[in-house]
Design a protein with these regions (language model features):
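Substrate/ligand-engaging "lid" and interaction regions
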Residues: 1-193
């Protein structure tokens, strides 16, 4: 997990982009975070304003570090609550690449070596427990006080739209977690709503 605002160390984020071990980026910026506004971020800004601009900068750093090697592309899992979140993120990144006049070979690498995955998360978490009696009973059962005690439904699924080989890269199946890699999230979205 990387937060570029801890001590303002954007250079450390860019250093991670150059890591041969990096394979996956997961974003969860809220639906407002997947947005493009022309001129809001500059290539050399530290850091760029929007998440898509930051991601474009990270991808460009990686492209340069590995001389555009196709096998150094990343799986980018967008978890924002918007339709086609991966595709929307990719559109934003393309807009920034064009705004910044980045080389066509980079844009080609960004779109073909990287996989922008749309995802669907389905699990209801209603919020903090406010009933003092229920809270006390749960804390007694747990054996400790938890200031942020919450509950969630037992059912949960994360559906990732991507190539089948992504399932082998991600450790979810081995861990027994209900995560599926599918060619299209649409049927799962329809089932959810």
């Amino acid at each position: 997990c990387v937060c570029p605002y801890i001590d303002g160390k954007w250079d450390e984020v860019l250093e991670l982009a150059r890591s041969a071990d990096l394979e996956t980026i997961v974003s969860n910026t809220t639906e407002a975070g997947i947005a493009y506004t022309q001129g809001d971020s500059q290539f050399d800004q530290v850091p760029p304003n929007s998440f898509p601009a930051k991601l474009t900068r990270v991808l460009f750093e990686r492209y340069k570090a590995f001389n555009g090697a196709a096998d150094k592309g990343l799986a980018i899992l967008s978890c924002e609550l918007i339709d086609n979140n991966g595709k929307e993120l990719q559109k934003c990144c393309n807009n920034y690449a064009k705004d910044w006049n980045l080389e066509p070979a980079f844009i080609d690498w960004m779109n073909n070596a990287n996989t922008f995955c749309s995802t669907l998360v389905d699990r209801i978490v209603p919020g903090r427990i406010r009933d003092p009696k229920e809270l006390a009973a749960m804390e007694e059962a747990n054996g400790y006080h938890d200031a942020a005690l919450d509950v969630g439904e037992v059912f949960g699924v994360w559906v990732i739209e991507g190539p089948a080989e992504l399932e082998d890269k991600l450790p979810f199946k081995k861990a027994g977690v209900n995560v599926m890699v599918v060619p299209d999230v649409t049927p799962y979205k329809k089932r959810k709503v």
